[in-house]
Amino acid sequence: MQLGVNVDHVATLRNLRGTTYPSIVELANIAVEHGADFITVHLREDRRHVRDDDLYALKKHVNVPINLEMAATEEMLAIAKELSPEFVCLVPEKREEVTTESGLDTKLLYDTRLFIISELQRHGIKVTLFLDPSEEDIACAKRMNVDKIELHVGAYCISRAPQELEMITRAAQLVHEAGMICHAGHGIDYECAAAISKVKHITAINVGHFLVCEAITQGMGNAVRKMKDIITS
């Protein structure tokens, strides 16, 4: 199983004081040195953490794939086409939310998203949709011809309820049967990672806030190495 490390909240710490530290590139490279297979960043419309220049610095100075999370807007499409990250993950976005609250509703803005997906793929970028573990949304994603699905596993990470893990397991099977690659993300800590890593057909997880918090006491390298050891054991 692969590990994507989201470095958004490294930028959050930096932006709180308007400084140049901590360096998002330095922390990303530490994560890579200790087992991260790719680096994830979410460029929000309000630029509350990662900024445009961070994307280009990461693309230039980090030697693993960049996974750009973004809303399905013309502005973000233009940025993605110029940056040319290896992967783009389309996510829902609300200005008032603290973090992404749910997966995409695939029925909303269907034509707009379909256009953006086709444009990204035309530029050689693999496209992921961030979805709740819903059979209806997975079927819609298949019709949209995306490459991957990232399952929103936040409900399980909060509740640790067996039925939530069963929903994730079933959704991962549906993604696989539809011919798409399945990832998972949102709210994952060490304990959740151990359970999710055992789910068949999930090939990667994205972890951000938890690892940045762990890095404060344990160091980014140690936190990433522990997470990678858990999901590959």
UniProtKB/Swiss-Prot annotation:
Function in brief: Catalyzes the complicated ring closure reaction between the two acyclic compounds 1-deoxy-D-xylulose-5-phosphate (DXP) and 3-amino-2-oxopropyl phosphate (1-amino-acetone-3-phosphate or AAP) to form pyridoxine 5'-phosphate (PNP) and inorganic phosphate.
InterPro entries recorded: Aldolase_TIM (IPR013785), PyrdxlP_synth_PdxJ (IPR004569), Pyridoxine-5'_phos_synth (IPR036130)
Residues annotated as site: Transition state stabilizer: 150
Gene name, Swiss-Prot/TrEMBL: pdxJ
Protein name (record): Pyridoxine 5'-phosphate synthase
Enzyme Commission designation: 2.6.99.2
Biological processes, Gene Ontology terms: pyridoxine biosynthetic process
SUBUNIT field: Homooctamer; tetramer of dimers.
Gene3D superfamilies registered for this protein in UniProt: Aldolase class I
Family: Belongs to the PNP synthase family.
Reaction catalysis annotation: 3-amino-2-oxopropyl phosphate + 1-deoxy-D-xylulose 5-phosphate = pyridoxine 5'-phosphate + phosphate + 2 H2O + H(+)
Binding residue positions for 1-deoxy-D-xylulose 5-phosphate: 8-9, 44, 49, 99
Active site: 42, 69, 186
GO (cellular component) term, any one: cytosol
One Pfam short name: PdxJ
GO molecular function, one term: pyridoxine 5'-phosphate synthase activity
Pathway linked to the protein: Cofactor biosynthesis; pyridoxine 5'-phosphate biosynthesis; pyridoxine 5'-phosphate from D-erythrose 4-phosphate: step 5/5
Positions annotated to bind 3-amino-2-oxopropyl phosphate: 6, 17, 187, 208-209
Protein localization: Cytoplasm
Keyword terms of this UniProt record: Cytoplasm, Pyridoxine biosynthesis, Transferase
Organism annotation: Anaplasma phagocytophilum (strain HZ)
